[in-house]
């Protein structure tokens, strides 16, 4: 194995701590007799455990070795794979090196573990190549990643040579992308102590669609039109969904992500205290072949908070314009995002700010930077009943209540639980359905 791995060129950036690199070192030590057998077995088991952990996280099955190698190909961001992501496979000298690397992966796919297993008295690789995973709920692993990895893994296993692997892998890069953006649709920002960050995939995204949101047809239409323009490469506006609590603003954003993910839409969730990282985040994604929504949920600022300045700088562009593949999407219960007080309107009570009204105007102008502002208001009584009936109709086992009983109970529920809203209706149906189980 170490001979094969040493021949990689474009895909040589595996990382010294990668499973493949570590196994390569172990096999080299075994071949040269440079390590005692019990130590080799222990080192192998450490990497097998890492592979099992990876398989559990991403839902690998059947042949974990093949799935792992496929995962490496999918995740490896190099000059070749990133170019294929942007423009697909094209004629060029680099294809010679790519096919040489794919020939290496073909040999790794067909690698014979029997000699080392027999010599060390182990069978772990045989088990990995004939693996039956414990059934798991979709929320426990990255289901969309699992489906893509296993499909490509099976196709590569059936490929006769590096030319077929080249076609399969480059088609994946073109259609799905490379790295974490190719395998996931939503991410959150994880800061580290050095002031930098990583993007971590979000596993349990709600599978909601806009059609699941009852009512709000004008709002959904406007959001869909703006998103359609965005993913089609046309001009689109930053979006502010504002209005009453529990009316489906955040749900609409998740739904639009699900509906357009197959066309390259991705979402990065950011919190207010992370706004100082916005320029770094945009620099990381601006050259990728995806459309990114930077999502801010429940956006608002108190009088003393100044983080809005980072957001304004990104929206307005400054020296560097906002990339065409980045859109700011925010939800808020406020139409004016920065809190305003009566004192703000009086230049005489400036507390050191000679032109306080100018300062106030600067703060309150943030909402105007969102060219697409969509208002969500609480439903009236009839609309609330329509939502209750609609959600109840989706229950697979239905409800034992008559319609009149259902609506009367819904009215009593909203009085005690925050008033009329779509969220209240959903919580009510959850409660009623729970009583029947």
Positions of the model-derived regions?
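Conserved AAA+ ATPase "SRH/arginine-finger" region at the nucleotide-binding site
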Residues: 349-364, 371-385
């Amino acid at each position: 194995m170490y001979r094969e791995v040493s021949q990689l060129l474009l895909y040589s950036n595996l990382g010294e701590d990668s499973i493949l690199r570590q196994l390569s070192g172990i096999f080299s030590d075994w071949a040269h007799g440079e390590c005692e057998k019990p130590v080799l077995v222990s080192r192998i088991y450490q990497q097998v455990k890492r592979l099992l952990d990876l398989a559990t996280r991403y839902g690998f099955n059947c042949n974990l070795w093949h799935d792992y190698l496929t995962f490496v190909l999918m995740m490896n961001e190099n000059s070749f794979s990133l170019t294929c992501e942007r423009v697909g496979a094209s004629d060029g000298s680099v294809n010679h090196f790519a096919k040489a690397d794919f020939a290496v992966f073909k040999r790794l796919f067909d690698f014979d573990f029997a000699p080392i297993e027999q010599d060390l008295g182990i069978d772990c690789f045989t088990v990995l190549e004939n693996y039956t995973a414990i059934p798991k709920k979709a929320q426990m692993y990255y289901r969309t990643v699992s489906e893509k990895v296993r499909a490509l893994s099976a196709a590569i296993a059936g490929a006769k040579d590096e030319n077929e692997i080249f076609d399969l892998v480059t088609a994946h890069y073109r259609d799905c992308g490379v790295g974490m953006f190719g395998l996931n649709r939503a991410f959150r920002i994880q800061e580290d102590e050095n002031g930098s960050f990583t993007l971590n995939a979000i596993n349990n995204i709600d599978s909601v669609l806009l059609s699941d949101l009852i009512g709000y047809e004008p709002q959904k239409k406007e959001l869909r039109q703006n998103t359609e323009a965005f993913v089609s490469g046309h001009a689109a506006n930053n979006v502010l969904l504002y209005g009453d609590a529990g009316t489906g603003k955040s749900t609409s954003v998740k739904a639009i992500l699900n509906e357009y993910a197959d066309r390259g839409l991705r979402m990065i969730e950011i919190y207010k205290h992370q706004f100082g990282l916005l320029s770094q985040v945009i620099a990381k994604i601006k050259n990728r072949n995806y459309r990114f929504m930077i999502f801010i949920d429940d956006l608002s600022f108190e009088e003393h908070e100044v983080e809005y300045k980072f957001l304004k700088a990104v929206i307005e562009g400054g020296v560097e314009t906002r990339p065409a593949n980045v859109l700011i999407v925010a939800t808020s219960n406020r139409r004016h995002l920065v809190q305003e007080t009566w004192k703000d309107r009086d230049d005489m009570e400036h507390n050191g700010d000679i032109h306080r009204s100018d300062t106030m105007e600067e703060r309150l102008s943030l909402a105007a930077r969102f060219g697409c502002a969509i208002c969500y208001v609480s439903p009236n009584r009839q609309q609330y009943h329509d939502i209750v009936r609609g959600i109840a109709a989706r229950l697979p086992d239905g409800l034992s209540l008559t319609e009149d009983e259902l609506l009367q109970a819904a009215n009593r529920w909203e009085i005690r639980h925050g008033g009329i809203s779509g969220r209240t209706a959903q919580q009510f149906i959850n409660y009623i359905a729970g009583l029947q189980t």
